[in-house]
């Protein structure tokens, strides 16, 4: 969406007006890191889905994975939000500092648009009445499972976001069993 003045103002207006769960990714997170006063406006139980670089822009660099996880837990607690830190074993933190690690997914999912798919899955789950933490945990798991199914069908090399999308129905069918 970009980080120009109009986009910053639009995000500020959204955060001022929206009282329900908000799911933020990509440039919205970059805007927060450059306009820290907006972080205070995040609605309770909002969900942020940064990759490690976006997260470091929000909280500063970490010396190691343990320190980064501690910063993730503290950020969730300080701002009453869910943080989905995308990576090989995506970590999810809640405001009570609980941590969940995902066991699904594969390196082929590190492709353009994969994070957008994840954000869409989480947003759809929130829209269907799941709590923020449930939507984050289930969304991350289903996204990874769809990626695993896609890798079985097409391989990891050359996987694209639409391969993950095409496997989401099967992933949810497996979940419903």
Positions of predicted regions on the chain:
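Glycine-rich phosphate/dinucleotide-binding loop and adjoining beta-alpha-beta core of small-molecule
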Residues: 1-104
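Short glycine- and Lys/Arg-enriched binding-loop motifs that mark or flank ligand-binding interfaces
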Residues: 24, 83, 101-112, 116-120, ...
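Short beta-alpha connecting loops at secondary-structure transitions
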Residues: 55-59, 103-109, 119, 123, ...
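Short, small-residue alpha-helix embedded
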Residues: 57, 111-142
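Short, well-structured alpha-helical segments that form the helix of a local strand-helix-strand
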Residues: 69-76, 132-146, 161-169
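Charged C-terminal helix
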Residues: 147-177
């Amino acid at each position: 969406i970009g980080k120009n003045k109009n986009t910053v103002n639009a995000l500020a207006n959204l955060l001022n007006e929206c009282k329900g769960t908000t799911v933020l990714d990509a440039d919205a997170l970059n805007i927060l890191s450059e306009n820290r006063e907006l972080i205070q406006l995040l609605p309770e139980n909002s969900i942020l889905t940064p990759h490690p670089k976006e997260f470091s822009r929000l909280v500063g660099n970490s010396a190691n994975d343990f320190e980064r996880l501690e910063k993730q837990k503290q950020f969730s607690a300080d701002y009453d939000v869910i943080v989905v830190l995308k990576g090989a074993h995506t970590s999810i933190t809640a405001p009570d500092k609980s941590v969940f690690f995902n066991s699904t997914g594969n390196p082929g999912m590190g492709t353009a648009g994969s994070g957008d798919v994840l954000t869409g899955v989480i947003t759809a789950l929130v829209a269907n009445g799941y709590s923020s933490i449930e939507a984050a945990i289930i969304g991350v798991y289903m996204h990874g499972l769809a990626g695993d199914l896609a890798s079985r069908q097409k391989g990891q090399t050359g996987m694209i976001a639409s391969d993950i999308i095409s496997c989401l129905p099967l992933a949810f069918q497996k979940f419903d069993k």
